[in-house]
């Protein structure tokens, strides 16, 4: 073993430039390999944290020239209730953005600007929210919300966040209430999933109910049998004609394992 090290040192001294180039090449090669491997693994496992991933689909609109994922609320609701093969659905407003919240009172008042997503309660039946404390059913209550664990710890420290109040100092888009009570804390989602780590709270039951112009919502559905997705779309497209834009139709594309 000593002779191997000795020969290695001698080679380095005699061929310094070649040895340096070889070592640098190996470092670069291994760095690139690790980067590609990490990226490949992230793509391969995208949304795989959700146990029902193979049966989850996002509703898209397609024309002869384009395709887009956002929907108007009445339309998404009509589709979600159109087939017995659709076991569950959720409608999400992902564009609320960050909202400034305060906690505490008077001289110990603290403020936090955090992302908010409004949605219908079915989201917790479709996607896997790993509960840390509280209840996922809290989204049935318009006063309550779900927080990611990292946010709960940042705001409330190591004490329980359940029952604590967050007061929005500005309007929450698509939400009537400004005061939210923490009803559940979920484990943070990894980066390779479609869901963001945000405050989830229920969408106002009256928001955009009759609005056929506001294309801001995402609609996800859970199917009992993924092989029926084309039939579901075909039946709905026939029963719900798009006029005057007759070439527009709905589709449920495979969204990388979801």
Model-derived regions: residue spans:
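Short, hydrophobic secondary-structure boundary micro-motifs
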Residues: 20-21, 89, 258
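Short, cationic motifs built from Arg/Lys/His that form the positively charged side of catalytic pockets
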Residues: 18, 251-254
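Feature marks short, surface-exposed loop/turn motifs that line or immediately flank catalytic pockets
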Residues: 27, 97, 189-190
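Mid-to-C-terminal secondary-structure elements
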Residues: 119-133, 143-250, 257
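Structured, solvent-exposed hinge/loop segments at the ends of secondary-structure elements
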Residues: 33-159, 169-178, 234, 241
